Amino acid sequence: IHMDYGILGSSDLDQASPFAAKLQTNLLLPLIYPVIRDGRFKSRLLQKRLTQRKSEMGGYVQAFMEMLGGARPYVTVQSCKNQFYSDLVTPLPDKINVPGTEIHIFYALKMGEKYRERYERHFANPVIHKQDLQHEELLACYPERWAQLVKDIMEGKR
């Protein structure tokens, strides 16, 4: 399979050892899975905190939650566990360079410099599109801009 373009978002490429990945999965899944399955946190404290964050951060948190798509009762906990864990333990080499493939990364500056360093470590020549935004804010809050950027990349304008 050959791709002309690879487009990644803000927090892709998280990695951990099998032990750390299992620990993260087992700690976070009970908190996150109810949001995926039911569209809301099971914990009243977390749901209250989400409500507070929605009022503090304007439309970003609401748009992000809407982007997640609401309740998905058909998604099993085992499926989420497998995806979360495998994302963390799948090895990724450094300085990937596939001739004829351009790697484009939508980099949310508000996530921090460590992400830029990660992109530059794993890809030989990534094209980094800096956005002065939060995690996935471009897609969640400005889908037209996101789509235009993807279109411009595909048409060779970026």
Give the location of each predicted region.
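Short aromatic-enriched loop/helix-cap "lid" or pocket-rim segments at secondary-structure transitions
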Residues: 17-22, 116-118, 141-143
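Catalytic histidine-centered segment of alpha/beta-hydrolase-like enzymes
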Residues: 131-147
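C-terminal alpha-helix
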Residues: 148-157
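Flexible "cap/lid" loop of the alpha/beta hydrolase fold
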Residues: 2-35
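Conserved serine/cysteine hydrolase catalytic core
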Residues: 75-121, 138
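Conserved alpha/beta-hydrolase catalytic His-Asp/Glu region
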Residues: 17, 37-96
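Short, structured coil segments at secondary-structure junctions
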Residues: 2, 122-124
